[in-house]
């Protein structure tokens, strides 16, 4: 009924459409365009620069370890040292029902010079009650931390991430 050319063209258009839908859904809500909208292209481009400097990597990994300890905290706020952790304080999860945390933080990149810099991380955190029921959590999120050396100690001074 249709010439063979039109049949192939419709088939190719259908395949192209399905491929686009699948690839867009795979990106989730925080694809590259969402990151660019929130952070701007210049900051998103920072994530492509690999840091190989061992000193800078140690600073970043030490701060990531501190953040993981803070995110892994379960319980009330009693006995925590919130004053000494800078902007990482926002990652404390105070809930008396939480007895276990499943936290993952990956270093994306870092750059430091003249006592200031930034760290890009990708993280997720889930919190469970005594019955091992999820009570709170978030999927993977990218976060950019501004860092500064204050009184000889590297500190996260600002956290920027998509809400």
Q: Where does each model-flagged region fall?
A:
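Core segments of small alpha/beta cavity-forming domains
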Residues: 31-106
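Sec-dependent N-terminal signal peptides
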Residues: 14-20
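Short beta-strand edge/turn micro-motifs at domain boundaries
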Residues: 140-163
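N-terminal hydrophobic targeting signals that begin at the initiator methionine
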Residues: 1-2, 28
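C-terminal motif of bacterial Sec signal peptides marking the signal peptidase cleavage site
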Residues: 23-26
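Surface-exposed, charged secondary-structure patches
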Residues: 93-135
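Bacterial N-terminal signal peptides that target proteins for export
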Residues: 2-14
């Amino acid at each position: 009924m249709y010439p063979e050319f039109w049949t192939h063209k419709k088939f190719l258009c259908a395949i192209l459409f399905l491929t686009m839908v699948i690839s867009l859904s795979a990106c989730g809500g925080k694809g590259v365009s969402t990151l660019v909208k929130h952070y701007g292209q210049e900051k998103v481009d920072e994530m492509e620069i690999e840091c190989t400097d061992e000193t800078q990597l140690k600073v970043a990994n030490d701060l990531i370890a501190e953040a993981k300890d803070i995110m892994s905290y379960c319980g009330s706020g009693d006995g925590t040292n919130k004053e000494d952790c800078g902007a990482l304080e926002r990652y404390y999860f105070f809930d008396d029902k939480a007895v276990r945390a499943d936290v993952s933080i990956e270093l994306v990149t870092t750059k430091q010079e003249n006592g200031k810099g930034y760290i890009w991380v990708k993280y997720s955190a889930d919190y469970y009650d005594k019955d091992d029921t999820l009570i709170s959590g978030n999927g993977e999120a990218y976060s950019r931390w501004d860092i500064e050396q204050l009184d000889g100690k590297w500190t996260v001074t600002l956290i920027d991430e998509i809400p």
